[in-house]
């Protein structure tokens, strides 16, 4: 059985870890980094992921996708999506089913399809380290992700060629990473997770007793559209406004300028965590009839803090709700853990310290803790980690729409999962032969104010007066937090059950097609790699042959020279094309045309060998007169 890997699929950065010798190990990617930017770029002939994609973003802004996690499992008309439509340099579109998709070079793509490219890179990173194929993974999601977003994340895993063994909440994973070595006593931990695109707070009780550990989530809350990207956008808008005041030009209309501005804003934000002021300097940011324009704006830490103050305050309300749901006060919290890159901001740390009345722990890496926790959970599933029990919760209440457009809850938020619940309902009209089960997720009483997860019909109900038929509705949430629903007519025993797919979401056929596309691209990538290899070999041979022709000089007959030159020209022409077989054929013909050249080179080499042999005999003749001397090797440090 192969290893199950742990993946933190982040909004800004992603990370992969595996259990190695009983310990979770964060793996370095091909670029030598422990985290990979969650950025994907599409060019004419390839898909680029991570740091290389980030580097080319300025020149390819409309086909470079970042923060895709903010779109996953969302509808195009959602307010959160509409906010992003106006500020993202790439195109966000409405799919046929109403989902938010993206478009690149005329191709429409679902967010899980794009996210799968990041997961593929994580998979490859793990395979390079382990030296074997990886097919199974534990993937993390924000605790406050709804059913649609969890389903979409699992779809992304499937498209990437991974069997997702478990979806685990990010704060829970961070608590696992923190608590796995704490062997005795009880701790109540608050995990404050402010990442690139999402915010979560989870209150978790860690019970360690005689080697057995239980991680029980008491409550969770959050905002799936609040994170570092929003902090960046505040700074981007400020810089764009200041530039417009000075120059009268709106940079928001120029995608290339906005991409440069985004990179500069992110860099300035990071710098202001360790310094009190910085300068954003972008020469030639744009131009008008009077010539090129340069952006030079000084920013202080205080200015940045004033721009994002309300965002930081927005994170405090979920803290209060989570504590109330767990029936705890701030004094009951033993430790506070910060997760997510945005928690490096001093103002965020100050707000958390003031709220809880204690300093957060500094021994948890905010960028890596979630992946480490995912790897530990992978170890639990594979049996490599024993005596650890993880009890997670569903973040939002689940129920159905009943008469009067009311949401009737079957499972309350913060219920430990997996769990089941059932309730008996009846008909609203006389002789009603079918009922529609409309499944909802949320906390509002009015059905339409909650998230619709889907609906299905139970028909064949025997005619009867309203209120007489008994319809039992069963909700079953699995360990991934994904819902399965059934409805049964208790009189006839007729049953209808479904795994809830969002009223939008990808169909089974769409996911299967995307999996096939990904496999086809894997073949394409392999062929492309082989083509490049053939080109490089052919190019190297031409270079070496030219050199040998020059060295041979007049010893090479002009007839052979012409034949070799024609063969080299043929190779050069073949290299410019995309036909691997044509390149290899031209390469072989050059080798054959160079036969005479090889003979000359070998003869020259043998002649030099003879000269060296004579020199060796002379040296041996005087060897008896030579006295051995002690010597000390002197190493040349300049090498």
From Swiss-Prot:
PROSITE patterns: HSP70_1, HSP70_2, HSP70_3
Protein name: Chaperone protein DnaK
A molecular function (GO) term: ATP-dependent protein folding chaperone
Known function: Acts as a chaperone.
Compositional bias annotation for Acidic residues: 625-639
Lineage: Bacteria, Pseudomonadati, Pseudomonadota, Gammaproteobacteria, Alteromonadales
Entries under InterPro entries matching the protein: ATPase_NBD, Chaperone_DnaK, Heat_shock_70_CS, HSP70_C_sf, HSP70_peptide-bd_sf, Hsp_70_fam
Keywords annotated in UniProt: ATP-binding, Chaperone, Nucleotide-binding, Phosphoprotein, Stress response
Gene that specifies this protein: dnaK
Entry's family note: Belongs to the heat shock protein 70 family.
Chain segments carrying region Disordered: 602-639
Induction (UniProt): By stress conditions e.g. heat shock.
Pfam families xrefs: HSP70
Modification sites for Phosphothreonine: 198
